């Protein structure tokens, strides 16, 4: 399958190029979208990809787009994909309502998977969080997420996804149960998220379930960002023969 990398100059984009250089499970890098000069040496690739700032040409040259860009960038990409539908795997977070609506429109034309986190470990953390939220009915739930000092969105998309999982298990009103700036006493049907930014932390998420006299903490730490690139490539392979629909990462991992 021919892969197009959108957001190739970013942290995960560079890791995607590195994985594809070795021909990851038969995937071929066919196009790379860049706004400025790309520093990657493509001579090591078995097939020279199209490196372009022409979005339409970039989309036409591939069968699947893997996106790790910025919200505005993804919005522009979706406009191009609506004209020329291709499989989409996106890990871009912090999206506006309009962008999410365009994603739903694309899902009528092509298979896509949008996830705040592409790692198997986070998928498992979500499942454990749902179970703990359901069983520990009297526990107060708090989420702490830590990332590098260059991350732009806070709370992280992964933390918000974990919040949604816990709120759904409890039957809370998802729009009103979230607390990100706590003042005064804690309300019972609330879930807090604290965001920490510093250094070069790839990502750490901890969910605490606090009871009287004891507490449980479930935690996931990313020690290497390559897990996100490999997860996205696995998603591309998984989507290859799927029908048009917006898929969830939990479906991919069974």
UniProtKB/Swiss-Prot annotation:
The active site is at residues 147, 151. (S)-2,3,4,5-tetrahydrodipicolinate binds at residues 148, 157-158. Its EC number is 1.17.1.8. It is found in: Cytoplasm. Keywords: Amino-acid biosynthesis, Cytoplasm, Diaminopimelate biosynthesis, Lysine biosynthesis, NAD, NADP, Oxidoreductase. Signal peptide: none annotated. InterPro entries: DapB_C, DapB_N, DapB_N_CS, DHDPR_bac, NAD(P)-bd_dom_sf. GO terms for biological process: diaminopimelate biosynthetic process; lysine biosynthetic process via diaminopimelate. Catalyzes the conversion of 4-hydroxy-tetrahydrodipicolinate (HTPA) to tetrahydrodipicolinate. HAMAP family: DapB (MF_00102). This is 4-hydroxy-tetrahydrodipicolinate reductase. The gene is dapB.
């Amino acid at each position: 399958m021919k892969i197009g990398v959108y957001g190739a100059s970013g942290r995960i984009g560079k890791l995607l190029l590195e994985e594809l250089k070795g021909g990851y499970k038969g995937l071929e890098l066919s196009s790379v979208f860049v706004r400025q000069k790309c520093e990657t040496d493509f001579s090591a690739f078995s097939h020279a990809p199209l490196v372009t700032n022409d979005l339409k040409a970039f989309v036409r040259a591939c069968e699947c787009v893997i996106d790790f860009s910025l919200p505005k960038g993804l919005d522009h990409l979706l406009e191009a994909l609506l004209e020329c539908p291709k499989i989409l795997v996106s890990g871009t977070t912090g999206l506006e309502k309009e962008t999410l609506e365009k994603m739903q429109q694309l899902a009528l034309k092509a298979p896509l998977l949008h996830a705040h986190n592409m790692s198997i470990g986070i998928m498992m953390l979500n499942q454990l969080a749902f179970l703990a939220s359901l069983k520990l009915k009297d526990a107060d739930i708090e989420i702490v997420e830590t990332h590098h000092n260059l991350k732009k969105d806070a709370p992280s998309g992964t933390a918000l996804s974990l919040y949604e999982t816990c709120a759904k298990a409890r039957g809370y009103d998802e729009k009103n149960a979230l607390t990100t700036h706590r003042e005064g006493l804690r309300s019972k049907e609330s879930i807090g998220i604290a965001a920490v930014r510093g250094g070069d932390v790839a990502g750490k998420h901890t969910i605490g379930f606090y009871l009287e006299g004891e507490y449980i903490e479930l935690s996931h730490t990313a020690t290497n960002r390559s897990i996100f690139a490999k997860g996205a490539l696995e998603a591309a392979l998984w989507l290859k023969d799927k029908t048009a629909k917006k898929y969830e990462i939990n479906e991919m991992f069974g």
